[in-house]
């Protein structure tokens, strides 16, 4: 997997807690939204987030890291890591289909690892996502296709 790390910041600058309500007993929640949106703000949540940007460009802020994004950008944001994607738009502009994302409960991933030992390598990915993982190349393309 081709990924780069961003680093975390102390909780004193953590932003607002976003409460994500799963659909029923679902362990995974998929959603999409445009930009600007009330959901696009500096925030954190206990769920792991896999996030695809479909349109526009700008800056991903995750922890104390800052990284440019373009369409096709895919990032994995760890549990309770403050984050936001800021698009470069002109006043009045709207990106109707910018974001596709998936929220996963970390405990679900750990239960999966307990049930299927061959997935134990995913624990390393969970740890690395605490500083955000950004995918590039074929990894980003394949992950993006799975999200949509």
Predicted regions mapped to residue ranges:
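A hydrophobic/aromatic-rich effector-binding and dimerization subdomain
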Residues: 2-12, 17-26, 78-147
């Amino acid at each position: 997997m081709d990924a780069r790390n961003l680093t975390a910041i102390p909780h004193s600058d953590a932003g607002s807690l976003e409460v994500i309500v799963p659909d029923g007993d679902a362990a995974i929640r998929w959603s999409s939204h445009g930009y600007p949106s009330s959901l696009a703000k500096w925030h954190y949540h206990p769920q792991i987030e896999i996030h695809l940007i479909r349109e526009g460009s700008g800056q991903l802020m995750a922890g104390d890291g800052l990284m440019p994004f373009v369409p096709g950008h895919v990032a994995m944001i760890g549990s309770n890591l403050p984050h936001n994607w800021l698009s470069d738009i002109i006043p009045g502009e709207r990106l109707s289909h910018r974001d596709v994302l998936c929220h996963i409960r970390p405990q679900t991933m750990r239960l999966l690892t307990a049930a299927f030992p061959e997935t134990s390598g995913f624990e390393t990915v969970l740890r690395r996502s605490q500083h955000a993982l950004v995918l590039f190349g074929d990894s980003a393309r394949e992950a993006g296709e799975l999200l949509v």
